[in-house]
Amino acid sequence: MEMILSISLCLTTLITLLLLRRFLKRTATKVNLPPSPWRLPVIGNLHQLSLHPHRSLRSLSLRYGPLMLLHFGRVPILVVSSGEAAQEVLKTHDHKFANRPRSKAVHGLMNGGRDVVFAPYGEYWRQMKSVCILNLLTNKMVESFEKVREDEVNAMIEKLEKASSSSSSENLSELFITLPSDVTSRVALGRKHSEDETARDLKKRVRQIMELLGEFPIGEYVPILAWIDGIRGFNNKIKEVSRGFSDLMDKVVQEHLEASNDKADFVDILLSIEKDKNSGFQVQRNDIKFMILDMFIGGTSTTSTLLEWTMTELIRSPKSMKKLQDEIRSTIRPHGSYIKEKEVENMKYLKAVIKEVLRLHPSLPMILPRLLSEDVKVKGYNIAAGTEVIINAWAIQRDTAIWGPDAEEFKPERHLDSGLDYHGKNLNYIPFGSGRRICPGINLALGLAEVTVANLVGRFDWRVEAGPNGDQPDLTEAIGIDVCRKFPLIAFPSSVV
């Protein structure tokens, strides 16, 4: 009996010591964790998110600081809301933060991350990014498609001329979706989506993929609520959309294999790389589909959102509109002719306008999440491996400590002599991200946006119908991964030719 009691006492003491050690270890670690709002059991801080998370996260950061730790259910989330904090994440420790979180949507829609944007950080991602940059997104390649951009911008201008002659309004939001879609479709597939059934179907599938990527699958953060994703059809949607996209791309690739066309589009280029056994990296047929998908997502969404917000802000700011019109119209020779990309290169105020729009309205207000691969210290805080990271670019680019008390105002003049570029060197301005995961298609998006705005503003005067905000379009944001306007931008063009 005494032996049993002794053994029980020893076991109890051992278990107590082990639990105490674990508790002390966890407590010591927690001492250096970033500030955190109080969280609820099971759901963590999910109740503190609004339909516009970039706004609610900014509000929390104003209270808890530019580096804070939240929990979305069981998942720790590091939220970065200042350029100084972003410096450590995107520069100092970039290689540790370069991975992507695994998600059901990415796994199902992107074949487990076989593209460039969502691929896990590693050799495959490095090789795929290299193939993309060296073969599809070089300056020479972007310049080679200038005629495509000119054709499509001119087609849009013709529609606006007709609206002007009949004094009717035009849905600019719709035009700004069609324009980059047609350009990307011709560049990537060799066909125009508005004139080709397969390309139209592909555009529809890409939009569905973006919508699914922007949804919030509660089951990934709170496993006991995974049944909700099933009931609302999220899992079935992923399977259906993925299958539809894959079938369409199989058809596109097969048509390219059978065609004898001297004009090489992106699919042709990738197929030639696939056939080249001496390229050093073997591109698989399946990989081609998802590289093209990246081109559509980046080439259409970023540009359409940028154009929509640019015209919104210019119409709201008559002084800025007049200043830009003066710059552009003094350049046009002969008056009213198409403004070419070479002419746009020297338009300083136009470039300042685009920079300011991207500051206030980055296409992705929160840079695509990253995943920490190993334990690290950030600004003196302990951050554990497996933590997901959200960089709130929208909050960083409206920081009054950096941009001044007028940070919320549209003021292109602040960029005329700023020296800022789009490559993420200054972490207070990161509309396309920074570091290893920076958007590789910057030149593709900007080239089309700049020449489009130049022709829209140079060749037309603009007005909107008076509404609740008078004669100014409102700034209400839609809900989604890419934050466009909630309501379409309807405006009246008046030709000045």
UniProtKB/Swiss-Prot annotation:
Gene this chain is encoded by: CYP71A13
Residues at which heme binds: C439
Keyword Iron included in the entry's annotation: yes
Record-annotated disulphide pairs: none
Catalytic activity line of the entry: (E)-(indol-3-yl)acetaldehyde oxime = (indol-3-yl)acetonitrile + H2O
Transmembrane segments: 2-20
Protein name: Indoleacetaldoxime dehydratase
Organism: Arabidopsis thaliana
Main location: membrane
